From Swiss-Prot:
Gene: Bglap
Domain Gla residue range list: 50-96
Native organism taxonomy: Eukaryota, Metazoa, Chordata, Craniata, Vertebrata
Signal peptide: 1-23
The protein's name in its UniProt record: Osteocalcin
The protein's role, per its UniProt record: The carboxylated form is one of the main organic components of the bone matrix, which constitutes 1-2% of the total bone protein: it acts as a negative regulator of bone formation and is required to limit bone formation without impairing bone resorption or mineralization. The carboxylated form binds strongly to apatite and calcium.
PANTHER family: OSTEOCALCIN
Post-translational modifications: Gamma-carboxyglutamate residues are formed by vitamin K dependent carboxylation by GGCX. These residues are essential for the binding of calcium. Decarboxylation promotes the hormone activity.
Disulfide cysteine pairs (residue numbers): C72-C78
Binding sites annotated in the UniProt record for Ca(2+) 1: E66
Length: 99
C-alpha cells in the first residue's frame, strides 16, 4: 500500500512539474507588458508639454485679491472678522469698498 501511494505521489509531482515548465509565457505575450524606449519617450514628452518650463507644475495664476487680503491681515479687526465671516465680507465692512 505504501509503494502504491508513493508511486502515485511521484506521478503527481512529475505531472505538476511538467505543467510548470510548459507554463512559461511566450515572448509575444510577455512583451505586451513593456513598451519600447521610443513609446516611453513619447509619453514623457507629451506630459512635459503641459508643464511650465520644466519647473514641475503649471504656474498658478496670480490672485487679484491678494493685495486686499494683505491689507486685511494687517488690520487686527479685519483679520478677526475675516475668520468669522470670510475675507470679502470683512474687507467690505471695514473699508467700505467692494472687492
Amino acid at each position: 500500500m505504501r509503494t502504491l501511494s508513493l508511486l502515485t505521489l511521484l506521478a503527481l509531482t512529475a505531472f505538476c512539474l511538467s505543467d510548470l515548465a510548459g507554463a512559461k509565457p511566450s515572448d509575444s505575450e510577455s512583451d505586451k507588458a513593456f513598451m519600447s524606449k521610443q513609446e516611453g519617450s513619447k509619453v514623457v514628452n507629451r506630459l512635459r508639454r503641459y508643464l511650465n518650463n520644466g519647473l514641475g507644475a503649471p504656474a498658478p495664476y496670480p490672485d487679484p485679491l491678494e493685495p486686499h487680503r494683505e491689507v486685511c491681515e494687517l488690520n487686527p479687526n479685519c483679520d478677526e472678522l475675516a475668520d468669522h465671516i470670510g475675507f470679502q465680507d470683512a474687507y467690505k465692512r471695514i473699508y467700505g469698498t467692494t472687492v
